[in-house]
Amino acid sequence: MSEKVKFEKRESLKEKPDTANLGFGQYFTDYMLSVDYDADQGWHDMKIVPYAPFEISPAAQGLHYGQAVFEGLKAYKHNGEVVLFRPDQNFKRINNSLARLEMPEVDEEALLEGLKQLVDVERDWVPEGEGQSLYIRPFVFATEGILGVRSSHQYKLLIILSPSGAYYGGDTLKSTKIYVEDEYVRAVRGGVGFAKVAGNYAASLLAQTNANKLGYDQVLWLDGVEQKYVEEVGSMNIFFVENGKVVTPALNGSILPGITRKSIIQLAEDLGYEVEERRVSIEELFNAYDKGELTEVFGSGTAAVISPVGTLRYEDREIVINNNEPGKITQKLYDTYTGIQSGKLEDKYGWRVEVPKY
């Protein structure tokens, strides 16, 4: 039997929000998981504590030099059962991110067990409505109070939970407008593009704001060397349907290896679609569109799962894909993926991990 994580009970519980108006990342549960690290003890003192502000040194290295990584995954409730979706993949990826920033890796099994116990404590916070979930945010940051530029000797890991509404506000997929960024770059090979580090997202905000001002929802990034090849969207990996084939940029060290991406590729192949992972130039996409060969575009990520792209703008040209409607392949993949997540469809892959009652 797994060892029980220490539990610090709060005096009173919060009033839970109206599940009809959850939005994303606006509400937080009563408790969080906390783990500390120092060079002598390693990772230690895992405990479930009340969600609350905490003290940190003004000289904490994470504030100055950016040693901070995070993850995002979800828990679902179906017929009273609470499950996590592919949490092992998230903890493998957080270790890859930690290693890249010279931060101490975590015990994946111990952390998964701690997460299960946290979600069990908070199972009443898991919404059960269509498309709703409990968003899970693990993150690690340097806490040692010293201004020397070196790897910190002290860190904190927290996991916070946020009940979240349906991304689209219902069952119908809604197409997004994407701006292809040709001035700024997100990442270069040899850098940290493959890692889920805080700085990647900070560096993307200016381009994202500029795109929003022009009426676009997100930015599609090109490679950082030639600014010719498509890489990823701000919060999603990207897929194209060309001549009936599902095409996505190959992982090259500057693209985040999305867990949803990985799952979608496997589902697409099992549904009988031909999948290609390769370099995709922006010129190829617009040429394929002109020939009538580019029929669908969609993004994949934890928040939206699948987000159809209806409009794509590059330089002074804007194209509308599939009359701004989700394509058949996009819809099929979305329905299958979310069906497995929610428990409505059989999970032959073992992706759903049950949260036991401790």
From Swiss-Prot:
Keywords: Amino-acid biosynthesis, Aminotransferase, Branched-chain amino acid biosynthesis, Pyridoxal phosphate, Transferase. It is an enzyme of class 2 (transferase). SUPFAM superfamilies: D-aminoacid aminotransferase-like PLP-dependent enzymes. GO terms for biological process: isoleucine biosynthetic process; L-leucine biosynthetic process; L-valine biosynthetic process. GO terms for molecular function: L-isoleucine-2-oxoglutarate transaminase activity; L-leucine-2-oxoglutarate transaminase activity; L-valine-2-oxoglutarate transaminase activity. Its EC number is 2.6.1.42. The keyword Electron transport does not apply. Its cofactor is pyridoxal 5'-phosphate. CDD domains: BCAT_beta_family. The modification N6-(pyridoxal phosphate)lysine is found at K196. It catalyses: L-leucine + 2-oxoglutarate = 4-methyl-2-oxopentanoate + L-glutamate; L-isoleucine + 2-oxoglutarate = (S)-3-methyl-2-oxopentanoate + L-glutamate; L-valine + 2-oxoglutarate = 3-methyl-2-oxobutanoate + L-glutamate. InterPro entries: Aminotrans_IV, Aminotrans_IV_CS, Aminotransferase-like, B_amino_transII, BCAT-like_C, BCAT-like_N, BCAT_family. Signal peptide: none annotated. Pathway: Amino-acid biosynthesis; L-isoleucine biosynthesis; L-isoleucine from 2-oxobutanoate: step 4/4; Amino-acid biosynthesis; L-leucine biosynthesis; L-leucine from 3-methyl-2-oxobutanoate: step 4/4; Amino-acid biosynthesis; L-valine biosynthesis; L-valine from pyruvate: step 4/4. Gene3D superfamilies: 3.30.470.10, D-amino Acid Aminotransferase, subunit A, domain 2. The keyword Transferase applies. PROSITE patterns: AA_TRANSFER_CLASS_4. It holds the Pfam family Aminotran_4. Disulfide bonds: none annotated. PANTHER family: BRANCHED-CHAIN-AMINO-ACID AMINOTRANSFERASE, SUBGROUP IIII AMINOTRANSFERASE. Acts on leucine, isoleucine and valine. Belongs to the class-IV pyridoxal-phosphate-dependent aminotransferase family. This is Probable branched-chain-amino-acid aminotransferase.
